[in-house]
């Protein structure tokens, strides 16, 4: 199974790149973590945010291979404890499809992305900067993988 992180934003600070890549490299080949970056729309004083969200959403959905299981990362989504995420990852694996996780930009995800998602996951009730979410998701997925594979990374 491949897990795709489809995220808005292309020029992240070095610490984001370093953090994401650290967890990405830990995954085995049979559960690869891939990052697809979508260019953020230009935002300014008079920017049409609804139009920017729509365009970002179109680009995100176009980047997802047909048949992938789509999960949005969004506030109204389901809060998962780490063992629940591990169970969810097992379900994804048994489903036999690759998974695409959608991370929106500063204003979140487009309505079309939310509609296309079969599931919605909420990392926190806190507002998190979208670059940080990449690192948190990568670490959380690695932790879930470690639980499922009896790897000593996760401790109860």
Swiss-Prot record:
One of its GO terms (cellular component) is cytoplasm. It catalyses: pseudouridine(1915) in 23S rRNA + S-adenosyl-L-methionine = N(3)-methylpseudouridine(1915) in 23S rRNA + S-adenosyl-L-homocysteine + H(+). The lineage of its organism: Bacteria, Pseudomonadati, Pseudomonadota, Gammaproteobacteria, Alteromonadales. The gene is rlmH. S-adenosyl-L-methionine binds at residues 73, 104, 123-128. It holds the Pfam family SPOUT_MTase. The keyword Nucleotide-binding does not apply. InterPro entries: Alpha/beta_knot_MTases, RlmH-like, tRNA_m1G_MTases_N. This is Ribosomal RNA large subunit methyltransferase H. Keywords: Cytoplasm, Methyltransferase, rRNA processing, S-adenosyl-L-methionine, Transferase.
């Amino acid at each position: 199974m491949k897990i795709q992180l489809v995220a808005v934003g292309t020029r992240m600070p070095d610490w984001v790149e370093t953090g994401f890549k650290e967890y990405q490299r830990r995954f085995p080949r049979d559960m690869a973590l891939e990052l697809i970056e979508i260019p953020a729309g230009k935002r300014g004083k008079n920017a049409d945010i609804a139009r920017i969200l729509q365009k970002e959403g179109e680009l995100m959905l176009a980047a997802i291979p047909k048949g992938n299981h789509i999960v949005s990362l969004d506030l109204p989504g389901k809060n998962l404890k780490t063992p629940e995420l591990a169970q969810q990852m097992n379900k994804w694996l048994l489903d036999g499809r690759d998974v695409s996780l959608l991370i929106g930009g500063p204003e979140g995800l487009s309505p079309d992305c939310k509609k296309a998602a079969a599931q919605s996951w909420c990392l926190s009730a806190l507002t998190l900067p979208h670059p940080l979410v990449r690192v948190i998701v990568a670490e959380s997925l690695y932790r879930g993988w470690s639980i499922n594979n009896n790897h000593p990374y996760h401790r109860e």
